[in-house]
């Protein structure tokens, strides 16, 4: 499969006939937000997410995330038969993954060497719940503190945000007020309590 980069730093409109990869690209993007292979809208009769997007040991999806203080990358890779994540504290550079002959490096050690020692590379994040906690800022637990800088929002109550994003990506009918209220409720740090006395 040829190497491809897609810039998504503004409004993007995908057009094309059936089977050219529009939904494939949207699902890869949705996976960044929901990290839930069962909720990507892949029909049961199609190949699984892992089999389709990561057919080879050197298959990767790299997401570059822009933030106020610079960019970082989220690397999705297959390890021990399932997709896991690593965070790289640097803007994306294709030279990390592709050699001068335009071939993708086959070993993680080669990629690590290309990234170099000057950029932080996280340990493997194998739990999808932990990954979502990292990017949605539910990071008060001690083991998540090194990942705090990778949060795209800061909320312990983020659970409805990935669902709402998923519904937008999968063209589910949504009301704008529902989306707005979901985001507002997710950002609130207040604990709601109900007095039954």
Q: Where on the chain are the PLM-derived regions?
A:
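Pre-Walker A-like glycine/lysine-rich segment at the N-terminus of P-loop NTPase domains
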Residues: 1-29
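Generic recognition of flexible, low-complexity loop/linker segments
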Residues: 2-3, 48-51, 168-171
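Active-site-proximal structural scaffolding
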Residues: 7, 22, 54-56, 176
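Generic structural signal for hydrophobic core residues of well-folded globular domains
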Residues: 17, 29, 33, 186-191
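Generic detector of solvent-exposed, compositionally biased contiguous segments
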Residues: 27, 39-40, 53-56
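Post-Walker A helix-loop "phosphate-sensing" segment adjacent to the P-loop in P-loop NTPases
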Residues: 31-44
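Nucleotide-state sensing region of NTPase/ATPase domains
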Residues: 47-147
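Extended, Lys/Glu-rich alpha-helical coiled-coil stalks
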Residues: 119-197
């Amino acid at each position: 499969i040829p190497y491809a980069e897609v810039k998504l730093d503004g409004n993007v409109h995908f057009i094309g006939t059936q089977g050219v990869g529009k939904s494939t690209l949207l699902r890869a993007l949705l996976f960044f937000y929901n990290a839930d292979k069962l909720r990507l809208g892949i029909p049961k009769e199609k190949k699984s997410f892992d089999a389709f997007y990561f057919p080879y040991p050197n298959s990767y999806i790299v997401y570059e995330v822009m933030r106020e203080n610079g960019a970082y990358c989220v690397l999705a890779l297959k390890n021990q038969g399932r997709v896991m994540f690593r965070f790289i504290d640097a803007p994306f550079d294709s030279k990390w993954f592709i050699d001068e002959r335009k071939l993708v490096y086959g070993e993680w050690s080669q990629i690590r060497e290309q990234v170099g020692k000057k950029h932080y590379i996280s340990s493997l994040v194998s739990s999808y719940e932990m990954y979502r906690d990292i990017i949605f800022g539910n990071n008060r637990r001690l083991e998540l503190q090194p990942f705090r800088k990778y949060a795209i929002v800061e909320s312990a109550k983020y659970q409805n945000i990935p669902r709402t994003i998923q519904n937008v990506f999968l063209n589910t009918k949504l009301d704008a007020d529902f989306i707005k209220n979901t985001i507002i409720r997710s950002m609130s740090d207040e604990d709601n309590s109900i007095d039954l006395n």
